[in-house]
């Protein structure tokens, strides 16, 4: 891998696309094992520069300058200042909400332009996705001037809270009498909380992009709780995120996440170490025992045990060890450059571990028992546990982000398929700030075949995860022309249509397909999607839908997760067993070329 030259798959560009789909998938999956996406070093370098100059330097300079805590380079002077903590959270929310943090740039499928977010959400006429149809005043799927106004108002309210100096707080002075920087004025939290909720009720994309499931509770704590309660509540919040993520890794999915993530890391140059995460490369690229150890000892165990230690420890050295472990944990994730690129989030959580548990240790009056009311403690714990519990029991009702299933591998997912030339119709959607990814790559100077092979690497990546084997199985069993179709990873395709995705299949489900169909008008069979819901924690199956954009849902069914994870990504034994629970009536003899066919 060079600085400007990537590791492109070693295939014949002129003939590769003529091969059967699963032959292509196998070649690209095997290439992924050793090279990941094969991105040139320039791309991760771009992300590092964004982290250093925009997030860290610009952010801390603005925050320290407006808070009166000394120059930004004097980290020892401000790292444990409460107002800095508050403003750094708000700064992170601001960048997320603009689209300059997670799901940014080429790793997330944004090539030209590299930003989604604000380009979509500050523009009337773009697609929006309401979370609940029953909420009055949220009808439709088109962004209005009102939507743009409340979104821009949300951004402005965050910026205002960041730039205004802190105000004195009696509850803070009672604990830290020498503090002079104060806290963010509680009334400044009213507007961002209200506007984020309004934005979310009108368009779930903005709420999820702003990481509302984590930052909205924090902003509520900033606005209504006295200082000690605020710190303890923040500890409960971060531990809920960690533990929820750890619990979500139980099961068969997460082990499949680690190998392709390590393979894509520019910080793991050793090919043998990457191959060590697979059973018997190139014959068997299911996860190895080493990958299982990394997943469930380095991941699941750390995310559950360490937060509990931090939450209850009153020993400095034990707390220090826990903090160091969580900082290393988040730095490791950052170094792998996951496809959703939540880099700012990981750096923030590393800082929060230091600030909350070393800056305000339990033994100094900031433990759970030090909250002003046990009723308040129980209420906060119950509120923080509600959506993770509901989302794991009923994943169809709750996004995987409020369910705290980050990195779990248990995600709602989809593959989109188009008949030859049909994908180009997506480019007729207007307004739409970006074109299809293959067109973005060609606009950067890549030949059409190279652009297409690059995008097919993303479906090979999907095939290396548990859902991929099931999705490909449904498509192979139901589409007799699959080899001729253009197949897309829905997470990437979604990014070009609504400006954001974070591995969240609920953003590219039936609602988005219906919105696209209303604008494009695909013929039956032209645009067929296989979409699957996350696995419920008490279930052994995943439920899928086969969707024809012109006809709606045409089949529902499920597959057993064990069958999916036991197969190779390229399905050498054919589709895994599928159980059909419903199929739309289909008049005899009326199957059009390229339309789904009954088994």
Where are these regions (language model features)?
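Alpha-helical membrane-anchoring segments
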Residues: 1-599
